[in-house]
């Protein structure tokens, strides 16, 4: 084949005509120091606060400090291979995480990458980690119940959809148990759950995931884990990633529940970050904006107005206290941000009252409006009765000759305390809770020995399930007890009492 010169020149001319000058311009900087997950970078003069940076080896970073001559950034990943003198690139994007239905049933790290070995997450939807919370106009007051399945919670410190209810207590008092039971209780409902584990042992997180899987709760749950072995920046950002995933469902008009386990460890991680970034320390060496750290997170949980879709995001933050000191810096901060708290006490826990809820110190500021009418009817005096019982029990220790009324009150109180105990991983439906509290309030348990109450309760539920199913379903549908229904419940309880005592 003969090569013709004019053909070659024509091809060259064509290529020159079609040549497009594509140059990728990116602003770069040089690492001047790195350690403990914090990098100081020189040369990124156009960087934005919260912007993602690209470190060598594909590791991401997030801009936290903007100073005159350098930028302080948190490395979101393994930083041991990053050295001084390495080049860092700006991405022009604010920190974001994947969101959507594809995350349900998965365990991800603080930046949304899967860590459960089930392959990549297929989603094209990303959302910014730091978003401003909805304004006043976009919100609506809490009016729907978020059933926890725990008698003590649903009766005395009810939680509503869109509420922020703090779970506070010393270590090993059952804080995570309350949260996990609440997730398990959402089975068969319309609530998507997000469990954010911050600074916990990996074995503990694996245990929680296994329990959720055993009860079929992973079908509607996302787990975000920033374990104790991960760097402070990842522990700091994990709750924001979790709430961003929850907001996706809230903004679609769905209902979501998020658990932060626990925010004390996030505050410690943020303190570490701030001190490494040379920010001035304040009380307990926390930085001045540690209140804003938690308030901007918890304000993102709310009930949206009907015009905005009517979705909700309910938050159950957990705070660990030291030796029951609720007046420390972080506990008081979070108590003042949330709409109430469930206070778990170690003395109650060790005396066998589980969940170990201290009724006197626990409160729900907005949940009462969301409580079902039937529960309000039976649990209205419960808190007062228990408080009076505790007072009487304290006095009864001094003397033995008590009048009949006091003895009856003590006996009733003892039985109320007993029926509010509940085994872990066994949440109850609203109508069954109403029945057992109704039985206690109306004297059906007064003559029974306290030791038989657990068996009484289990057999009573079985009796209503098998022989009074229509009454149970009516109570479930009506959500209130009228005179006719009350008569039927009393008759059924009388019948069961005869059979139980026989």
From Swiss-Prot:
Residues with site note (Required for activity): 362
Species annotation: Pelobacter propionicus (strain DSM 2379 / NBRC 103807 / OttBd1)
Stored NCBIfam families: atpA (TIGR00962), PRK13343.1 (NF009884)
UniProt cross-references to Pfam families, sorted A to Z: ATP-synt_ab, ATP-synt_ab_C, ATP-synt_ab_N
Organism placement in taxonomy: Bacteria, Pseudomonadati, Thermodesulfobacteriota, Desulfuromonadia, Desulfuromonadales
Location(s), subcellular: Cell inner membrane
This protein's UniProt keywords: ATP synthesis, ATP-binding, Cell inner membrane, Cell membrane, CF(1), Hydrogen ion transport, Ion transport, Membrane, Nucleotide-binding, Translocase, Transport
Family, per entry: Belongs to the ATPase alpha/beta chains family.
Protein's name according to its UniProt entry: ATP synthase subunit alpha
